A protein has these predicted regions:
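C-terminal motif of bacterial Sec signal peptides marking the signal peptidase cleavage site
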Residues: 7-10
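Inhibitory N-terminal propeptides of secreted protease zymogens
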Residues: 17-118
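Active-site-proximal beta-strand/loop segments in catalytic clefts of secreted hydrolases
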Residues: 49-52, 84-85, 104-107, 168-172, ...
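Protease zymogen maturation seam
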Residues: 97-165, 173, 178-179, 365
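Surface-exposed intrinsically disordered loops and tails
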Residues: 127-135, 195-199, 273-301, 330-336, ...
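Subtilisin-like serine protease catalytic core
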Residues: 153-188, 194-246, 258-262, 267-274, ...
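Substrate-binding/access-modulating region of protease and related hydrolase catalytic domains
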Residues: 160-162, 216, 236-346, 357, ...
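Hydrolase catalytic cores
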Residues: 210-212, 232-241, 253, 261-262, ...
Length: 490
């Protein structure tokens, strides 16, 4: 990357998104890099890390004695949240017996509020030639990712995700989308002042990822990888794309409390180990009093905090999946970046694949081509999954399932968006949900509730080993395969 800091809600750069039933060309990939000014230290908000998985006793009164206010306790994860206007609060609270460290919370801009290109989204009525498929969902022929991972073949064995609960930690969701509503088990927002429902007509990142995992097989638009899994929709990013790590932590903890089997996080940040960060000085709406700080230890402890949350989830039976990031970064060579949450303990990190020109030659195009933007690295990627791409050159037009568009659009992942519509997007954010869907199929095949270590082992044993034999920098242990996964011995 040209800049030292990048973020993702989708993972680092904005995803490429386009939608329309009639072609509207654009040569811009709309993948804007984000400067270091986009990560902001919250001057009066703190994350407390315990030395163990248990919190010190009478923590509220001890926080008060340190001039702080305890705002949340995550018992079992060894984490707590607090606020304080005292600039010396962190130092004071760190001296409490049993406290490992006290760090500031950080906010980041995960994706632009209007990251989609300025086009109309696809609706059911736009389909002038409804296609016939195994499941009869009208836009199923656009879902090349399902073909790549052999999802239909997995369904034919009877494995459809029934009995699995997937928590989707993301931005807002279209809770009334006809292709989603029947599978929604619940929703929750940790974004102050915003409900879980996505407002407006812009691209809905959360709705898109949720649809890939578990859109209902109902003879409508699309179908999810695990169409009978239930979805717990947890909002940890604002509709405008911003988020904080404390919201992420609370979302993970909540998913555990609701007995989720799988967590998908198509979000996060790639932060330099050593860099200057902006502190909002406790006034996030007023930038005139901001200051710049440099605290390498605080970033390292932030990764520890997220790792405590993800480890807590894993210990409580939740398989945690996160997108690897969209910076085309070689994690083996560049050790300066801290990837959160994909680099946290017990997290399964997913890279992205995507075809080039698939709509023009669907039977000849390689669906397992590595996406141009995906992060990679032998220790940074565990599995690959379909994430799409938009690098096909030229103005060729294609038509599939009654939808006519420039050929490059069909190389992206087609799923749900706001106001009951459908759209394309590309990014490792789209890859993670394919892998989470496979994990849900595994849990469902096992009858519900399967130890994360077993889910991981099945995913590893069943992945298609592409690239160099064994674990390689691009595909990890391989591209996930739904059919092979549900065919393993349970």
């Amino acid at each position: 990357m040209g800049l030292g800091l990048a973020f993702l809600a989708s993972c680092s750069k904005e995803e490429i998104t386009v939608a329309d039933t009639q072609p509207q060309n654009s040569t811009s990939s709309n993948q804007a890099e984000v400067s270091s000014e986009s990560v902001v230290r919250r001057g009066q908000s703190y994350i407390i890390l315990s030395s163990t998985d248990n919190l010190p006793g009478d923590l509220a009164s001890q926080m008060q004695a340190a001039n702080g206010t305890l705002t949340g306790e995550l018992s079992g994860a060894g984490l707590a949240l607090a606020t304080s206007t005292d600039p010396d609060f962190a130092a004071k609270a760190s001296r409490i017996s049993g406290v490992r460290s006290v760090i500031h919370d950080f906010t980041y801009q995960g994706f632009a509020p209007n990251s989609a290109r300025d086009v109309e989204a696809v609706t059911e009525s736009d389909n002038t030639n409804p296609a016939t498929s195994a499941d009869n969902d009208r836009f199923f022929p656009l879902q090349w990712g399902h073909t790549a991972i052999q999802a239909p073949e997995a369904w034919n064995t009877g494995a459809r995700g029934k009995g699995a609960l997937v928590a989707v930690l993301d931005g807002g969701f279209d809770l009334t989308h006809p292709d989603l509503v029947a599978n929604i088990a619940g929703s929750k927002s940790f974004v102050p002042g915003e409900a879980a429902q996505f407002k407006g007509s812009a691209f809905s990142h959360g709705t898109h990822t949720a649809g890939t995992i578990g859109a209902v097989d109902n003879n409508l638009g699309v179908v999810g990888v695990a169409p009978e899994a239930k979805l717990l929709l947890v909002k940890v990013l604002a509709d405008g794309g911003s988020g904080s790590f404390s919201w992420m932590i609370q979302g993970i903890y909540y998913a555990v409390s609701q007995q989720a089997d799988v967590i998908n996080m198509s979000l996060g940040a790639a932060i330099p180990n050593s860099s200057k960060y902006r502190d909002d000085n406790g006034t996030p709406e007023d930038t005139s009093d901001d200051k710049w700080v440099n605290d390498t230890k605080e970033i390292q402890e932030l990764l520890v905090a997220i790792s405590k949350a993800t480890s807590y989830a894993t210990k409580n039976g939740v398989t945690v999946i996160a997108s690897a990031g969209n910076d085309a970064n070689n994690g083996q060579r560049d050790k300066n970046l801290v990837h959160i949450p994909s680099g946290a303990t017990d997290v399964i990190s997913i890279s992205a694949t995507g075809p080039m020109g698939w709509a023009l030659k669907p039977l000849e195009t390689n669906l397992d081509r590595m996406a141009s933007y995906t992060n990679f690295g032998t220790s940074d990627v565990e599995f690959a999954a379909p994430g799409g791409d938009a690098v096909y050159p030229g103005d060729d037009i294609a038509s599939i399932a009654g939808v006519t568009q420039y050929a490059f659009a069909f190389d992206m992942v087609f799923s749900l968006t706001s106001q009951g519509r459908y759209t394309w997007s590309a990014g490792t954010s789209m890859a993670g949900p394919h892998a989470a869907g496979v994990a849900a199929l595994i849990v469902g095949k096992a009858g519900g509730q399967l130890d994360p270590s077993r889910v991981r082992a099945i995913m590893r044993a069943s992945a298609d080993d592409l690239g160099k034999p064994g674990r390689d920098p691009y595909y990890g242990y391989g591209r996930v395969n739904a059919l092979r996964a549900v065919s393993q011995a349970f």
